[in-house]
Amino acid sequence: MDTDLTGLRWFKSSASSAAGCVEIAHLPEGGVAVRDSKDRGKTPHVFNRHEWECFLIGAKSGEIDLPVT
């Protein structure tokens, strides 16, 4: 996906600390860009709307939870 990321409004969870976390930006075509707030110079990961919705469904249902060791 070749997406223009200039001028995007990035945000993170209000529950996150100042130490850094994941930031997302909504894309005009409906997807999202995801980046690490500690290394904003790296190219963000870009997901279309369907990919992002599938991720959210999986995260909310516990599908992608790591096992407790």
Please annotate each region the language model reported:
Residues 1-69:
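Positively charged, low-complexity terminal tracts
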